[in-house]
């Protein structure tokens, strides 16, 4: 394409033009007010050049953010990038919500990803359930229960929730170009159940510091998907428990948090269940599908 040339980053002059020189593309736009860069198909650039680009951005503007579109397992793309568009976590969430991935296996996958990548890079990454390159959420998960479970995980796992326009009102769309259809403004109404649910999740994340900046801790479970988000303050603790299965599950969980007192009642922020307390560090719970 004449106006979209393919640049050879192995050539030093090209690297200087893109991010190395003072008047390079990356540096000059940061000086003009841009706060970061979202790199399309970042895997094609490779580790070395991405790391140089990210360092150049930080040198020009400390605190700037470089996020890359990475469909690979994200571990080794840090610190070449500050964050990624987390396709791996998206796949785990959607398959677990659909019932195609056993909860215990999904839990082990998430735990490993969190341990290997580290919380800090994940917090700078984007967690999306659909975008312009994928089928829309309502088409992937037609059932409301499955969609809501996936959204809960999107807003409570480490990462910045990234919403695709129209998904908050249940827009459908399969392969290209369906998923890129114009916004369905006719679906927007104050009483739309999916919009109301999305707003509840936005408020939940806004109101709980642990969900925005907190560390991740696995919660030992077998048939439920469970984890904890916490900061250095015991009050900033959120235990997330989800039942992706089709039947009610009664299980004893182990949050393994020494700061949680048995006298402190736990409050259900989404389901409205009665308050309950830990029993010698364990949590007895019954959760419907």
Report the location of each language-model feature.
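Active-site-proximal helices and loops of the catalytic beta/alpha 8
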Residues: 35-120, 125, 142-144, 153, ...
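Conserved, mostly hydrophobic/aromatic
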Residues: 29, 39, 66, 132, ...
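Substrate-binding/active-site clefts of carbohydrate-active enzymes
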Residues: 1-32, 53, 57-59, 76
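Short, solvent-exposed helix-loop connector elements
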Residues: 135-142
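Short, basic/glycine-rich phosphate-binding loops at helix/coil junctions
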Residues: 2, 128-130, 179
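Carbohydrate-interacting/catalytic domains
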Residues: 108, 147, 158-163, 167-289
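Amphipathic coiled-coil/heptad-repeat helices and related helical stalk/stem segments
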Residues: 22, 146-147
